[in-house]
């Protein structure tokens, strides 16, 4: 991957100017390292991102879907999955060190990274200590493509187990639209009531769509 199209190769460009100036395709090409006969690694990276619509779409693709494309086997699938997992862990480690109230943007990005590509509704809870630092996060309930059944008592039980003082609720809408439903508002109220009996605060409920996130707290619904 020394030169491509007569321009500076992605690796050399990164070393000279920093990773931030590289395109998604250039960053992907560095991970993939090699192309296939008749297709340079940059061409492969561009093709994959164009085919799946975005880097996020590519990383979210399952094994069978991705490996249906020429030149993609277990090795390159593993490399692509590693990109997504590294990004997730990077956000997670940053979130674990931060106060959620001081940096809500990181919290939203972290939850979007986990939930926005999921094909079923997932209800996730972030458990916080009394200084609103993250203790852990847990995907507590898994539903269908259009709904998820949530049990407030199980959330309270888990909060007591980890000695949480506060919670952030989050779930995704696989449809891609993040606008909360009446059912979303109802279950939020039920969780708040269950938690309030034990002085556990619900700081927010985030609904994650495709490329967007709606905060109950920002809308004044809590």
From Swiss-Prot:
Supply the source organism for this entry.
Yersinia pestis
Q: List the taxonomic lineage.
A: Bacteria, Pseudomonadati, Pseudomonadota, Gammaproteobacteria, Enterobacterales
Q: Which UniProt keywords apply?
A: Hydrolase, Metal-binding, Metalloprotease, Protease, Zinc
Tell me the GO molecular function terms. metal ion binding; metallopeptidase activity
What range(s) does the MPN domain occupy? 100-222
Please give one Pfam family short name: RadC
Question: What PROSITE patterns does the record tag this protein with?
Answer: MPN, UPF0758
Question: This protein is called what?
Answer: UPF0758 protein YPO0049/y0092/YP_0050
Where along the sequence does the record place the motif called JAMM motif? 171-184
